[in-house]
């Protein structure tokens, strides 16, 4: 089998999900991850600086929406590099997070926490 045929065969058998245009989707007027869990932004993150300030212990309660290897910025979605070297998705320049206390899709119990966490609305 030549290389071209091998590449074509791999493309045919690769799940389309890895080619998704965006890391999030809209559900009930808010952004969610692929499991339907609500996404949040943090007021203390500076829009567009390519950095998350939610690290260490904070990140245990507010896990970052991490990008898979090979993830690429697209439209309103960009990537930021975290202090630990991981790559995190951002929307309109703001890093995206989940909230550990949300237990099922549609929960949005993190909205307004400490007046600095907010549900992301496109």
Which positions does each model-derived feature cover?
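N-terminal secretory signal peptides that target proteins for export/translocation
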Residues: 1-2
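Compact beta-sheet-dominated domain cores in extracellular/mature segments
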Residues: 19-122
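Bacterial N-terminal signal peptides
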Residues: 7-17
